[in-house]
């Protein structure tokens, strides 16, 4: 089942979410916006099973990676920007 995955620019490039994902949905791509010069990307969202292990692994104060299940959206989660 596919789920919407959003990577926020608070990503510090630590790779914790990539290593936590049991279905290899996430990968790191080059990005100049952080010290690590890489950011998480979700090119294979169709493989996401919604376990949210990536969220649990994220060490930032505000989760840099979010998985929205079914009808959840940033608005329904109270995270609208």
UniProtKB/Swiss-Prot annotation:
Subcellular compartments: Plastid, Chloroplast thylakoid membrane
Transmembrane segments: none
Cofactor: [4Fe-4S] cluster
Entry-linked HAMAP family: PSI_PsaC (MF_01303)
GO cellular component terms given for this protein: chloroplast thylakoid membrane; photosystem I
Catalyzed reaction equations: reduced [plastocyanin] + hnu + oxidized [2Fe-2S]-[ferredoxin] = oxidized [plastocyanin] + reduced [2Fe-2S]-[ferredoxin]
SUPFAM superfamilies for this protein: 4Fe-4S ferredoxins
One Gene Ontology term of the molecular function aspect: electron transfer activity
Subunit architecture: The eukaryotic PSI reaction center is composed of at least 11 subunits.
InterPro entries cross-referenced by the UniProt entry: 4Fe4S_Fe-S-bd, 4Fe4S_Fe_S_CS, PSI_iron-sulfur_center, PSI_PsaC
Gene3D superfamilies on file: 3.30.70.20
Domain 4Fe-4S ferredoxin-type: 2-31, 39-68
Protein's name in the database: Photosystem I iron-sulfur center
Known function: Apoprotein for the two 4Fe-4S centers FA and FB of photosystem I (PSI); essential for photochemical activity. FB is the terminal electron acceptor of PSI, donating electrons to ferredoxin. The C-terminus interacts with PsaA/B/D and helps assemble the protein into the PSI complex. Required for binding of PsaD and PsaE to PSI. PSI is a plastocyanin-ferredoxin oxidoreductase, converting photonic excitation into a charge separation, which transfers an electron from the donor P700 chlorophyll pair to the spectroscopically characterized acceptors A0, A1, FX, FA and FB in turn.
Pfam families from the UniProt entry: Fer4_21
Binding site for [4Fe-4S] cluster 2: 21, 48, 51, 54
Organism expressing this protein natively: Chara vulgaris
Topological category with respect to the lipid bilayer: Peripheral membrane protein
Predominant place of localization: plastid
């Amino acid at each position: 089942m596919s789920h919407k995955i959003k990577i926020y620019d608070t990503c510090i490039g630590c790779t914790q979410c990539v290593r936590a994902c049991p279905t290899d949905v996430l990968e790191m791509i080059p990005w100049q916006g952080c010290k690590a010069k890489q950011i998480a990307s979700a090119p294979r969202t169709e493989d996401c099973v919604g376990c949210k292990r990536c969220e649990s692994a994220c060490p930032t104060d505000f989760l840099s990676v979010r998985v929205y299940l079914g009808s959840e959206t940033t608005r329904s989660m109270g995270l609208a920007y």
